[in-house]
Structure formats: C-alpha cells, structure tokens
Amino acid sequence: MTERKVYVLGRGGHDYSDAERFGKLVFLDIPNYARWDIDRLYRELEEGLADADKDDLFIVSHLASHCCVCTAILIEWFGRVNFLIYRKDKYEEHKLVVNPDVEA
C-alpha cells in the first residue's frame, strides 16, 4: 500500500507535525489571484488534488470557502472525504461518506 497523502490548504502558522503520522504532507498553496474567486479556486484545487486517492486525508484549516471547495471536489471524485481535525493537542481522523457507490 502506498503512503497516504495529507492535503493542507496553505502553510499558515500552524504546526502540522502530528499530522505526519497519517501520511505525507502535501501543501496546496493557493495563489493570491484565486483566493477570493471561487471559480479560480476550484480550478487551482482540482489541479493540486490531481494525484489524490480515496484514502488520502484533508486537514480542516484555512478559509472556510477553501475548505468547502476542497471537500466538494473530494466528494465529487470519491464519494467521501477523510478529514483530519485537530482536537485535544492532536489530529483525529474522521470519514464522511456521502455516496458509497462512487468508485475511484
């Protein structure tokens, strides 16, 4: 089995080191021109997530609009999204299955 990827929106000022126990961190850096343009944001994230797999994870952080678009893309492609949520000084994995019939 290949190592899972952990997608992170932006680099922020957070310490993501605990998330490394779940897989390789992949930073999705959004250019300033796409930051507030949802259509461009969608295209940037589609490109950044091109190598995503159904078992990869997404850290919930950054702007809410960016998290929403990233979640929508992953659900569209895989029927689910695997979140990493920071709670009690560590990351926890949470899976949201919306359409179990989608196969990747």
Model-assigned labels for residue ranges:
Residues 1-57, 69-104:
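Long, low-complexity, Lys/Arg-enriched
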